[in-house]
Curated annotation (Swiss-Prot):
One of its GO terms (cellular component) is cytoplasm. This is S-adenosylmethionine:tRNA ribosyltransferase-isomerase. It comes from Halothermothrix orenii (strain H 168 / OCM 544 / DSM 9562). Monomer. It is an enzyme of class 2 (transferase). Pathway: tRNA modification; tRNA-queuosine biosynthesis. It is found in: Cytoplasm. SUPFAM superfamilies: QueA-like (SSF111337).
Length: 341
């Protein structure tokens, strides 16, 4: 299957540069897989499409201020470092820009020496292994010196950093937000629970695997970068109960989908687990857990668009994207949402 098949043209003005004042005022396109019907509404009306006994599974990861700007020692060259994956205390996989001149042993100073990074090794995806030296607590140092790692297509500074977090973000570790969850408010979550719809959380720390561009010509040749995830026994039991009652398990986002499908050892049999996943879901994949998916509108030729196409069918998804462009939906991280049933 060719990567080109997942390309589409998007007018630049449809890339959402900032979030709406109210999270749940986003538009919502609803795709019904069985009938091919498409409905249009707003996100706060999502309850109308859910039934008592259904279960929403959300990702409670929290974005860390993973973008660091420093100076190479002793030249003073400006260096940007993006934290990707914690290996051990103070040792991280990172992306470095400009990267070509960053060799083993090179040092970078951040915040006038409050944090110093030393290149220890190279990674197989063009990144570096960096050892950090600092006093005190690493998280606190990063909170002070780091910036939120907004995607490159967001060119305006986001005034409220909290808007790039879900309202239920708890576990630090992501370098990008699980964007499907950005549409939920505390009030909407409360209303959903009051309707008898279940809500439960798992964790997948969003890393390079989620947003890394596909450079291969053929979809099958792309390799995902692994991301850490946790699916608890409670999640497994709640999903099992939901399935036994004939109700729907709805994944809030592609990250939840990948975590659940990674934990499915066989059809409809989930296992509690924690670890790393490099699962790559594209058309032809046989879904084992989810019955519905809430997601945003994704970049052309991205692994996220491929996952959505695997779930709803490529033709239906590409038709829905055409309609979204025609009706001027807002795209990408701060954009509108889609519910696939």
């Amino acid at each position: 299957m060719k990567v080109e098949e997942f390309d589409y043209e998007l007018p630049e003005e449809l890339i959402a540069q900032k979030p709406l004042p109210n999270r749940d005022d986003s538009r919502l396109m609803v795709l019904h897989r069985k009938t091919g019907e498409i409905e249009e509404t707003v996100f706060k009306n999502i309850i109308k499409f859910l039934e008592p006994g259904d279960l929403l599974v959300l990702n409670d990861t929290k974005v860390i201020p993973a973008r660091l700007f420093g100076e190479k020692i002793p030249s003073g060259t400006r260096i940007e470092v993006l934290l990707l994956k914690s290996i051990t205390e103070g040792l991280w996989e990172v992306l470095v820009r400009p990267g070509r001149r960053m060799k083993k042993g090179n040092r970078v100073s951040f915040g006038d020496g409050k944090l110093v990074g030393i290149v220890k090794d190279y990674t197989d995806f063009g990144g570096r292994i960096m050892q950090f030296e600092y006093d005190g607590d690493f998280d606190k140092v990063i909170e002070e010196l780091g910036e939120m790692p907004l995607p490159p297509y967001i060119t305006r500074k986001v005034e409220d950093k909290g808007r790039y977090q879900t309202v239920y973000a708890r576990k630090k570790g992501s370098v990008a937000a699980p964007t499907a969850g950005l549409h939920f408010t505390d009030r909407l979550l409360k209303k959903i629970k009051e309707q008898g719809i279940g809500i439960i959380y798992l964790t997948l720390h969003v890393g390079l695997g989620t947003f890394r561009p596909v450079r291969a010509e053929n979809v099958e040749d792309h390799k995902m970068h692994s991301e850490y995830f946790e699916v608890s026994t409670d999640v497994v039991n709640r999903i099992k109960e939901t399935k036994e009652k004939g109700k729907k398990v709805i994944a809030v986002g592609t990250t939840v989908t990948r975590a659940l499908e990674s934990a499915a050892v066989e059809k409809r049999h989930l296992k509690a687990m924690r670890g790393w996943t490099d699962i790559f879901i594209y058309p032809g994949y046989n879904f084992k857990v989810i019955d519905g998916l809430i997601t945003n509108f994704h970049l052309p030729k991205s692994t996220l668009l491929m996952l959505v196409s695997a779930f709803a069918g490529k033709d239906m998804v590409m038709s829905a994207y055409k309609l979204a462009i025609k009706n001027k939906y807002r795209f990408f991280s701060f954009g509108d949402a889609m519910l696939i049933l």
